[in-house]
Amino acid sequence: MFARSFSNASRTIARRSLSTRSGPAPSSLWSSRNAVIAGTTLAITALAVTSERRKVFNESAQKATSPRDSIIAQDSLKENVHKKSVRQDEFSGESTKPEASTSSDSVEKAADDAAQILEEKEAEASEPSQGAYNPETGEINWDCPCLGGMATGPCGEQFKAAFSCFVYSEAEPKGVDCVELFKVMQDCFREHPEIYGEEIDDDEAPAQEGTMEEKVEAAKEETAAPAAAP
């Protein structure tokens, strides 16, 4: 822009200088030519400088990023990072869901099993005793057929003492504190072999099934008849 104005002005001045002089001298003509050449040279130089400046400015403008473009780029970067984070969170949540579900199922199953066991034990405890001993009343039904009439024979008292000791025993193993009473009962059995011969044989042959202690335990657990009336 500046170069064009300067060039036009130079040409106008040169023309006016030539037109105002009729019949110019050779020296004047030479001076006018020099002025035109100088003006043209200056105009070309100014144009070249201006073009170079524009080129540099355009390149700088292309390389430089506007604030708006920078903000858009930052927003895009943030959006990508946010999406990636959300995807990772979703993946982590999906991977933990099966584990949480499995753990919850195991806990519920264990709770159901424990409740069922407690109900069964409670039902068993609430039922009347099925053996010679009734834990609800703490009494022993000596007339129970499961005792085989041993409570009424010649060694009935010895049997009752041994059996009662065994039933109420809290020692471990159960009945270990009733050994002496069992010996007394067995001695009584030996005095009456005609009645307690089978029990004596069992006592003298431990390899055979049915020791006295086992029979007492079996009698306690066998099905009992209704309790005798007082």
Curated annotation (Swiss-Prot):
Gene that this sequence comes from: MIA40
GO MF annotations, alphabetized: protein-disulfide reductase activity
Motif placement: Cx9C motif 2: 178-188
Disulfide bond positions: 144-146, 155-188, 165-178
Main location group: mitochondrion
Region Disordered, residue ranges: 1-30, 58-111, 195-230
Protein name according to UniProt: Mitochondrial intermembrane space import and assembly protein 40
Complexes and interactors: Monomer.
Keywords: Disulfide bond, Membrane, Mitochondrion, Mitochondrion inner membrane, Oxidoreductase, Protein transport, Redox-active center, Signal-anchor, Transit peptide, Translocation, Transmembrane, Transmembrane helix, Transport
Annotated membrane topology: Single-pass type II membrane protein
Sequence motif: Cx9C motif 1, positions: 155-165
Lineage, top ranks: Eukaryota, Fungi, Dikarya, Basidiomycota, Agaricomycotina
Subcellular location: Mitochondrion inner membrane
Species the sequence originates in: Cryptococcus neoformans var. neoformans serotype D (strain JEC21 / ATCC MYA-565)
Polar residues composition-biased segments: 1-22, 59-68, 93-105
